Regions:
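Ferredoxin-type iron-sulfur electron-transfer modules in oxidoreductases and energy-metabolism complexes
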Residues: 201, 235-263, 273-274, 278-331
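Active-site-proximal glycine-rich helix-loop-beta segment
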Residues: 270
Length: 331
């Protein structure tokens, strides 16, 4: 990305889409060079087969919340996987759809109801504060887990670096403590540089969470390694022994081929989520809900949206995805 455009998330996202072939080729090379095992999945079925070949039934696994893991239905693929995202845990416990990654749907929910859900998640009774007890339990489960499964916010293809951005710190636990880390990334999350990736991440948080940046960043460049022990390189000393990355297509190439790629500019800020929920009466809601996930889900579900519903829809987008772009992608 040229210097003049570095602070323009729309231009960054446009270049990511336009250069997707080049970025994919570069990502495969640089990730592999850093010791990651790279897998290409053309659809959710291929992703499921890869994950099931890695995570056997008898292996313990934790996961964080991400659009890709929801897209492929990680809970169905790995039934024993344990969710660690606090807001997702509460949403599931309350029977609510966690459709906005930046804002949990807890309107008109009492603190007592949330407390009950977290108490049910917690395995043992302790005197310590509830959130601290849940956090400690997640760390203990991570120490015993064979796999930590996450999505990711970006891959900087020039260095082969996986970037995670979050507020809770649980993604760091899931990606760093278990013996092996598996990250699932949509092809649209490939960036040419760290600067471009961070600008898009910041734009997502500013527009979705209304804050300048997330609390935690994790940079993962291959499996953990250290040369501190007698000058010999040792893997797995301060993190996972192996890092696997699944690069997921699952309809993204179809949108590109049909010239419907503008929705892939989406940075998952969630600004459009409340407006799009009006479309979802009677339909299964993609989680998180945004122009990209709705368009990808539509390739399979073929949502029937009335003209009146289109006329009532209104949203603003920081990367200028328009109603016309969304409507074109849904045709």
């Amino acid at each position: 990305m040229s210097q003049m455009n570095i602070y323009d998330p729309e231009m960054i996202r446009k270049e990511c889409i336009q250069e997707h072939g080049k970025l994919l080729e570069q990502a495969v090379k640089t990730l592999a060079a850093k010791g990651c095992k790279v897998h290409l999945a053309k659809d959710s079925a291929e992703a499921a087969a890869i994950i099931q070949s890695l995570c056997g039934e008898n292996q313990k696994a934790l996961c964080s919340f991400s659009s890709e893991l929801e897209e492929i239905n990680i809970k169905q693929i790995v039934p024993q996987v344990v969710q660690t995202d606090i807001e997702k845990i509460v949403a599931d416990g309350l029977g609510k759809v966690f459709y906005n990654r930046r804002r949990a749907p807890f309107d008109n929910v009492s603190s007592e109801a949330i407390t009950d859900v977290l108490k049910a998640y917690r395995k043992t009774d302790t005197e310590e504060p509830l959130f601290r007890a849940v956090s400690r339990q997640i760390k203990e489960m991570a120490n015993e887990s064979d796999w930590g499964i996450t999505g990711l916010d970006a891959i900087a293809t020039d260095t082969g670096t996986i970037i995670l951005a979050e507020d809770q710190g649980n993604e760091r636990i899931v990606s760093n403590i278990p013996a092996r880390h598996l990250a699932v990334a949509g092809l649209e999350k490939l960036y040419s540089s760290n600067d471009d990736a961070l600008e898009s991440i910041h734009a997502a948080w500013k527009n979705g969470a209304r804050k300048d940046a997330p609390v935690y960043y994790s940079y993962i460049t291959g499996p953990s390694r250290t040369g501190d022990i007698e000058g010999a390189m040792v893997c797995g000393m301060h993190g996972p022994l192996a890092v696997h990355v699944i690069l997921l297509d699952n309809g993204r190439s179809t949108l590109l081929e049909q010239e419907k790629s503008d929705v892939l500019k989406c940075i998952e800020c969630g600004k459009c989520a409340d407006a799009l929920m009006r479309f979802m009466n009677g339909y299964e809601v993609p989680a998180p809900l945004n122009c990209k996930t709705l368009s990808l889900a539509n390739l399979k579900n073929k949502y029937q949206i009335t003209e009146d519903a289109w006329n009532m829809l209104s949203f603003t987008c920081p990367v200028n995805i328009t109603m016309d772009d969304l409507r074109k992608s849904m045709q």
